[in-house]
Structures are given as structure tokens and as C-alpha cells.
Amino acid sequence: PAVCAYAQTSTTGTYGSFSPYSIYGVGEISKGGTAHSRSMGGVGIASRNRRFINVSNPAAVAVRDTLAFMADFGLYEDNKIYAQGSKRGAENTFNVNNIVMSFPIWRSSAFLVGLSPFSDVGYSFSSKEQSDELLGHVGNITYDSYGEGSLYQLYASAGATFWKRLSVGAEFIYYFGKLDRNSNETFENSTYRSITYGTRLNLHGFTGKFGVQYDQKLSPTMSMTVGATYRLGTNLRGYENHFAYASQSSVVDTLKSMTYTDTLSRVSDAPRIADELGIGISLRGSDRWSVEFNYLRSDWRKSNFESRKGFAATGKANFSSSVSQSFRA
């Protein structure tokens, strides 16, 4: 998504990811891939290495040892510092990157199941009221916005290799997770009621992904692989909980509490995960070295995030969905 940058000061929280841009849509999209793939810059569409599990292309599921059970477990740690003018924000994040298991089926075919984050929401902003007129009437006011949560993907892939060169594969993906976004308006003067409001989203959906790889020997020790993947777009389902309440001293008044069961499946502007097209090419010299280039394109213009409460950003931030393109090497 295309965004207009803004920032206040951040406070410490526990997040799978921390980014001011995760205030919009389903949050910050994970780069995905196993530790081996991430160490190679996130490539994998054209990777064929029997010693490592490749989750970037369903066709690569079949490129493995035909007798062994394989598993991969990864953790992700990230440290970020954001700055804009005199404002500073920093956060250390920690999350599970992936849990994957792969099994041989028959000869040159194999099966894989895995779990990994698809997107993460993690942000926290705080600012003070600057209007002298308002400060003179009601006193100090603090505005806070914070969000957290993750959307995960549970996937199962199957692939097969034909004529030792052509591999094809298919993958079923199930999305699920919870996203919380909250805002506070806190009055220092106890004669005024402070306001807390926000949205809780419980989401799920499913889609499919398809992949192909073709490997060509260039010499006894060198080969070239081309690969392609396509993930179908899908609507998200689930329910929304919009709430607002006012507090004064120890008294809390509920202003709004609305829960809709599976409401997202009944609306014409349901939030949507975009489709994704990926292509890649690699050059490999036995198991000693390899170079690879990947291109990914995803069109989010029909995601409907701008029109859905709980997905659209509020306040002065200007967010819109567009075409996302990624180059990895």
C-alpha cells in the first residue's frame, strides 16, 4: 500500500511487528520464507535445493530427499527506530517466523504443512493537545493510538517432479487471526470524562496458490531454473466489534458496543487479500553457489480497506491501497 508517513512518540508494547504503517489494512505484510530463504534476500521462487525446505513456491515441495522427513522452525527478531523531526520511536519485536514439516509421498512427489505470519499490526502513538484556547478551558489532554495483533496463514502444499526437470505444485492457504486498534482521549482534569474507542477484528479466509519450476542443465556442474507462482485473491470473513466508553474517576459508561457475527461476508465492500504473481530465475553451480532474482506483484486496489471501519486509518494520516511490487536478489 502507498502511505503518507507520520509519527508521534511510541511506547513499549509486545508486537509481532512494529511499524506506524501497520495502522492501515491488515497491517505490515510479512516477507515470509524460511531462515534459509530470508538469508538469501527473501528469494525462493526459482530455488531448488534438496537440503532445505522451500515454502516460496509450491512446486519446490517435491525438490527434496525422497526418503527423509524434514522440518524447519524459525524465529524472527527485529529492532527498529523511527524518527520524524523531534519525534522518536523505537521498538524490539520477536515473533515465530515459520513452523514447517515436509513428507515424501511417492517417488518424486511430496507433501508439506506449515504455519507462518501473513501480516502484523503493531504501533503506538501519543501526543498532547496544542491549542491554547482548549487548554485554557479544560486543561491538558493526551491522545493515544495503539494497535496489535497478527493474521496467520496455515498452509498445505503438494508437488511433483516430472522428467527430472519440470515441477508443479498447489497449495491451500487458510488465514486466521485477530487485530485490535484502539484510541484514547485522556483529560487530566477529573471533571471531564476520558474517552476510549476502537475496533476488534476476528478474521478468517482461505485461498489457493500454484507454482511451477523448470530446471535446465547448462553443464555437468551448472544449471538454470525458472519458476513462477500465483496466489489467488480472496475476501476476508469474520466479525467486527466496535466499542466506545467514557470514564470519570472510577465510573465507566458504555457508549457503544456492537458485535456482528460473520458480518464481513454479507457486505459488498468486504476486505480483500490481493492476488500475487511471482516470477524468478536462478543460476546454480552444484551445491557450492547460487544466484537468484525474484519479482513479485500484488494489486491491492480492490482491497476495500479505505471504506471499512477497523481497516481504514483515522485521523490526519492519508492512506490508500495501490499496486505493490517487490524485487529480490
Question: How does the language model describe each region?
Answer:
Residues 8-39, 104-329:
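Outer-membrane beta-barrel porins/channels
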Residues 6-119:
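N-terminal, post-signal peptide beta-strand-biased segments of exported outer-membrane/organellar beta-barrel
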Residues 1-2:
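Bacterial N-terminal signal peptides
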